Amino acid sequence: MQALVNKIWYQGHPLRWLLLPLSWLFAVITYVRRALFRLGIKSQTAMPVPVIVVGNITVGGSGKTPTVIYLIELLRQHGFTPGVISRGYGVDIQGVRTVNLGASAVEVGDEPAMIVARTQVPMVVGAKRVDAANALIAEFGVDVIICDDGLQHYALGRDIELVVIDGQRGLGNGLLLPAGPLREGAWRLDAVDFIVNNGGPAAKGQFEMQLAPTEVKPVKCDLTSGEYSFDKSQPLVAMAGIGNPARFFESLRAQGYQLALCQGFDDHQPYDKTQLRDLAQDLPLLMTEKDAVKCRDFAQENWWYLAVNAKLSPQFDEQLLARLREVAAAKQGNFHGIR
């Protein structure tokens, strides 16, 4: 099914025209919903601290999670105490839930588990972002909230909107769901504060981001750096359960890894030991960091993951920090802006 969807959205498959009437209906629904918030008919809750929403206008992965991790580290370097909220995709959460270090993807979602494992940032997940944000402030006293996804969750007031675009796939065929991959029309990009292009080239007004690979690490957590080594010249099986698996495989080939087999999975797909053991056979299995957090409880010693770090320009850092300081000063002056 996912292969057919990708053909419709990104390769010009003629089935998109049959779905177009549904896209028109979706356009009306999304426009009316946003208008209700802008007109004040539906309420939007402002937070007492700045809120940065990191999202996209397309379905599927675009590089939001590496961007969130980048922002966490950037803000810490400049004296802020950030916290993160998220929906916790695929997890049935009643109320809100704090993401503790070592929490499983089954409990909190794969991306929250990965973010906390990497950064140890204060994080709360919940279906209602407003409740998650209030819990984050009450429990941890953060001075900036980063909302992982949630661009279309207008009940949460936001001060800075940052959209991440997949530089390879762009906006696909430019159509709204279900005929295309768009959650909102391309016009929405004109209303956000920052557009980050993952993989570039960045258009005017956008900031290019590159994902730089780090060292290969074992999925098993009980191995330390002195107890393992990885030979990238050996044949291996690569797997990726992310929005654009091809990007991961292309990156591995460019780095000189010898890929005997590449297996893409749906984003957020759960795994089990037998499934992946049968996939790898006796070869090393190399996966993304987001996949690794779902496999640690049953990982084999020859299962590995490759993490990436987002790289953005100093100009991006300067502009985002300047905007954030403006917002923080206004909040301290008892100004609560709702956009």
Curated annotation (Swiss-Prot):
<keyword id="KW-0444">Lipid biosynthesis</keyword>
<dbReference type="GO" id="GO:0005886">
    <property type="term" value="C:plasma membrane"/>
</dbReference>
<comment type="similarity">
    <text>Belongs to the LpxK family.</text>
</comment>
<comment type="function">
    <text>Transfers the gamma-phosphate of ATP to the 4'-position of a tetraacyldisaccharide 1-phosphate intermediate (termed DS-1-P) to form tetraacyldisaccharide 1,4'-bis-phosphate (lipid IVA).</text>
</comment>
<comment type="pathway">
    <text>Glycolipid biosynthesis; lipid IV(A) biosynthesis; lipid IV(A) from (3R)-3-hydroxytetradecanoyl-[acyl-carrier-protein] and UDP-N-acetyl-alpha-D-glucosamine: step 6/6.</text>
</comment>
<dbReference type="InterPro" id="IPR027417">
    <property type="entry name" value="P-loop_NTPase"/>
</dbReference>
<keyword id="KW-0808">Transferase</keyword>
<keyword id="KW-0441">Lipid A biosynthesis</keyword>
<feature type="binding site">
    <location>
        <begin position="58"/>
        <end position="65"/>
    </location>
    <ligand>
        <name>ATP</name>
    </ligand>
</feature>
<dbReference type="GO" id="GO:0009245">
    <property type="term" value="P:lipid A biosynthetic process"/>
</dbReference>
<keyword id="KW-0418">Kinase</keyword>
<dbReference type="GO" id="GO:0009244">
    <property type="term" value="P:lipopolysaccharide core region biosynthetic process"/>
</dbReference>
<protein>
    <recommendedName>
        <fullName>Tetraacyldisaccharide 4'-kinase</fullName>
        <ecNumber>2.7.1.130</ecNumber>
    </recommendedName>
</protein>
<dbReference type="GO" id="GO:0005524">
    <property type="term" value="F:ATP binding"/>
</dbReference>
<dbReference type="Pfam" id="PF02606">
    <property type="entry name" value="LpxK"/>
</dbReference>
<dbReference type="InterPro" id="IPR003758">
    <property type="entry name" value="LpxK"/>
</dbReference>
<keyword id="KW-0547">Nucleotide-binding</keyword>
<dbReference type="GO" id="GO:0009029">
    <property type="term" value="F:tetraacyldisaccharide 4'-kinase activity"/>
</dbReference>
<keyword id="KW-0443">Lipid metabolism</keyword>
<keyword id="KW-0067">ATP-binding</keyword>
